[in-house]
């Protein structure tokens, strides 16, 4: 989460979705929320010019920064050369294999000001490494945080929220105004905490099937379940699960999606077209 580019000679790049965080009050509040410790494995995605990085390093923990902008990596190495526990990797976080940065015995705490233009696919990518993650703290567009934390029946509720809440405890911590960044974005941001479950409270029989069901259900979110899921499950089967085929997908909670997914997994013949 980069600092204001004052006296650095680096302009934020629109193609990288860069908005450098410079409000020290916001930075301090983020660090208090994270509460980093000296023995922890901290991984920061998109550090920018290192405003948050610096505060994380002061905790004494190891900090590995994953930065795509090749002009920023030498700036970061120079700025933090006095911290032997700092390392920067020039890579695209959307394609990066985070397994090389953690082990089950030394899980990582993921932190980042995620580029708004790729935040949703990046979150899905990061969730694939959840077994090596202690927790995640992300600055995101407020609308994305609302979707992550949304409950059934809310306008923001959809595929992202259902799947994130299957894997993690999701907490919206606080909002951040545009003025905290340089350049200022046009929208409000928010900090979210994602804490992966050791075991999902509502474990399904097959996650790939759950993913398919949720994706299909919300592909046409204004249509009823009997229409959106007709390739996967019959109306009679939905009724046998005590689920009304006439309701829209945003009315279903995670337990109902898990029930549908388990049924679809157990009855593969119904998937044949």
From Swiss-Prot:
**Class of the enzyme per the UniProt entry, highest EC level:** transferase
What catalytic activity does the UniProt entry give for this protein?
adenosine(1518)/adenosine(1519) in 16S rRNA + 4 S-adenosyl-L-methionine = N(6)-dimethyladenosine(1518)/N(6)-dimethyladenosine(1519) in 16S rRNA + 4 S-adenosyl-L-homocysteine + 4 H(+)
Record keyword Flavoprotein present? no
Its annotated compartments are:
Cytoplasm
Gene3D superfamilies in alphabetical order: Ribosomal RNA adenine dimethylase-like, domain 2, Vaccinia Virus protein VP39
Keyword set, alphabetical order = Cytoplasm, Methyltransferase, RNA-binding, rRNA processing, S-adenosyl-L-methionine, Transferase
Looking at the UniProt record for this protein, which Gene Ontology cellular component terms does it annotate, in alphabetical order? cytosol
S-adenosyl-L-methionine listed as a keyword: yes
> Which PANTHER family does the annotation name?
DIMETHYLADENOSINE TRANSFERASE, DIMETHYLADENOSINE TRANSFERASE-RELATED
Name the Enzyme Commission number(s) assigned to this protein.
2.1.1.182
Q: What is the superkingdom listed in this entry's lineage?
A: Bacteria
Designated name of the protein: Ribosomal RNA small subunit methyltransferase A
Family per similarity comment: Belongs to the class I-like SAM-binding methyltransferase superfamily. rRNA adenine N(6)-methyltransferase family. RsmA subfamily.
For this protein, what is any one GO molecular function term?
RNA binding
Residue sites binding S-adenosyl-L-methionine per the record:
19, 21, 46, 67, 92, 113
What this chain does, per the record? Specifically dimethylates two adjacent adenosines (A1518 and A1519) in the loop of a conserved hairpin near the 3'-end of 16S rRNA in the 30S particle. May play a critical role in biogenesis of 30S subunits.
């Amino acid at each position: 989460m980069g600092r204001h580019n004052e006296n650095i000679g680096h302009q934020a790049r629109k193609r990288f979705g860069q908005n450098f965080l410079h409000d020290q009050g916001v930075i301090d509040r983020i660090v208090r929320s994270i509460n980093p410790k000296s023995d922890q494995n901290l991984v920061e995605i998109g550090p920018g010019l290192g405003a948050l990085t610096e505060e994380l390093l002061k905790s004494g923990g190891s900090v590995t920064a994953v930065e795509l902008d090749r002009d920023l990596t030498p700036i970061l190495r120079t700025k933090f050369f006095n911290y032997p526990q700092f390392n920067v990797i020039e890579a695209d976080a959307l394609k990066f294999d985070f397994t090389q940065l953690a082990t089950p015995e030394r899980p990582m705490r993921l932190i980042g000001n995620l580029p708004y233009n790729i935040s949703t696919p990046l979150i899905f990518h990061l969730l694939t490494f959840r077994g090596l993650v202690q927790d995640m703290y992300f600055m995101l567009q407020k609308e994305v945080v609302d979707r992550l934390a949304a409950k059934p029946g809310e306008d923001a509720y959809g595929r992202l929220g259902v799947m994130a809440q299957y894997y993690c405890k999701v907490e919206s911590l606080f909002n951040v105004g545009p003025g905290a960044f340089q350049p200022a974005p046009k929208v409000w941001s928010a900090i979210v905490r994602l804490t992966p479950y050791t075991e999902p409270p509502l474990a399904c029989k097959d996650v790939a099937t759950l993913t398919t069901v949720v994706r299909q259900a919300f592909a046409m979110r204004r249509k009823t379940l009997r229409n959106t899921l007709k390739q996967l499950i019959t109306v009679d089967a939905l009724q046998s699960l005590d689920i009304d085929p006439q309701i829209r997908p945003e009315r279903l909670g995670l337990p109902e999606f898990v029930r549908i997914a388990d049924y679809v997994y157990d009855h593969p013949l119904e998937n044949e077209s």
